[in-house]
Every structure is written in structure tokens, then in C-alpha cells.
Amino acid sequence: MNYFDNKIDQFATYLQKRNNLDHIQFLQVRLGMQIIVGNFFKILVTYSISIFLSVFLFTLVTHLSYMLIRYNAHGAHAKSSILCYIQSILTFVFVPYFLINIDINFTYLLALSIIGLISVVIYAPAATKKQPIPIKLVKRKKYLSIIMYLLVLILSLIIHPFYAQFMLLGILVESITLLPIFFPKED
């Protein structure tokens, strides 16, 4: 990744000079570009593995359902980039891969997802130290998290249960990331 870090630094320096950015703005621009590049590679690796295992569509459905809720609900993050890769691959590739081959009762997944809704109602949005949520946005984000969760839940009742299980998996995983056990105690 050193090559990409150097290119990011070069481009951020270019933008700093061109737009007369101070040091803090330079750091913000550089961090933003690092996040974009890092996420691009995580997506590339995750979806490449899903294509290799022939579960691309199921990975996509799971991931999109997850992201629809996460956008407003936020939630815990992996402690390092490598752990994020591992968690993403396990959650969005291998769990769908096994779901295809294991007969899990749809009613069971639906019941777990309804319990997950309780987690969203109680804990969303879940701020982190690195990503605090402004107080003025908390109520709106909670409301939108609940609405999106309910929409995905209702949609899962309408579509074929085989595909719905991946939608439920996505929202269930997101509801788990909201639980306080994943957040360190504040001092």
C-alpha cells in the first residue's frame, strides 16, 4: 500500500498548493482519499472472492441491505484494516456461501431480524469516538434507521424467501454492530 500512500500524498499536496489549503484541510483531504482507496480495495477483494465462490449476487444483496441500515445507524468498526478485511469476507462472502448450502428456516431468520429491530430502536445511531454524530442529527438518523430497517424487513416478506434470507442477514449483522458490547467504556 506504500505506493498508493505516496500517490495520495502527492495528490493531496497538489490540491493543497492549488487550493491554498492549510495543514488541517490538507490532512482532511488526505484522510478522505485514504479512506476511499482503502474501501475500494476492501470492496475489490470481497467481491472478487464472492465471484470466485459464485456467490456474487448473494454477497451484493447482503451488503446492500447492511449498508441501507448502516448509513444512518452507524455502528462498531473493526479495530484495524486487516480485521475489517477479515470481517467483511466472513460476513459478506462466507456466511452467504454457507447459507446457500444450509437449510435455515426463514421464520427463524425473520424472528432474529425482528429482535434486531429492537437493537436498532434502542441503540441507533451508534456513534464512535472517531465518528461522533452531531446531536441535531441523532433523532433524524434514529428515525431513518428504523424506517429503512422496516422497509427491508417488509420487502423480505414480499420477495422469494431464498433471496430474502440474504436481506435479513444484512440487516441482522448491522443490528449486531449497534450493541454496546462492541464499544469500549468511556472514561
UniProtKB/Swiss-Prot annotation:
One Gene Ontology MF term: peptidase activity
The top EC class, named as a word, is hydrolase
Which Pfam family is one of those matched by this entry? Answer: AgrB
EC number(s): the record gives: 3.4.-.-
What keywords would UniProt list here?
Answer: Cell membrane, Hydrolase, Membrane, Protease, Quorum sensing, Transmembrane, Transmembrane helix, Virulence
Localisation: Cell membrane
Q: Where are the transmembrane segments?
A: 49-69, 82-102, 106-126, 144-164, 166-186
Name residues in a coiled coil. Answer: none
Q: Which GO terms describe its biological process?
A: proteolysis; quorum sensing
Give the superkingdom in one word.
Answer: Bacteria
Q: Is Cell membrane found in the keyword set? A: yes
Q: How does it sit in the membrane?
A: Multi-pass membrane protein
- Record's Gene Ontology CC terms? plasma membrane
* HAMAP family to which the protein is assigned, alphabetical: AgrB
The similarity comment for this entry is: Belongs to the AgrB family.
Function, in words: Essential for the production of a quorum sensing system signal molecule, the autoinducing peptide (AIP). This quorum sensing system is responsible for the regulation of the expression of virulence factor genes. Involved in the proteolytic processing of AgrD, the precursor of AIP.
Q: What is this protein called?
A: Accessory gene regulator protein B
| Name of the encoding gene | agrB
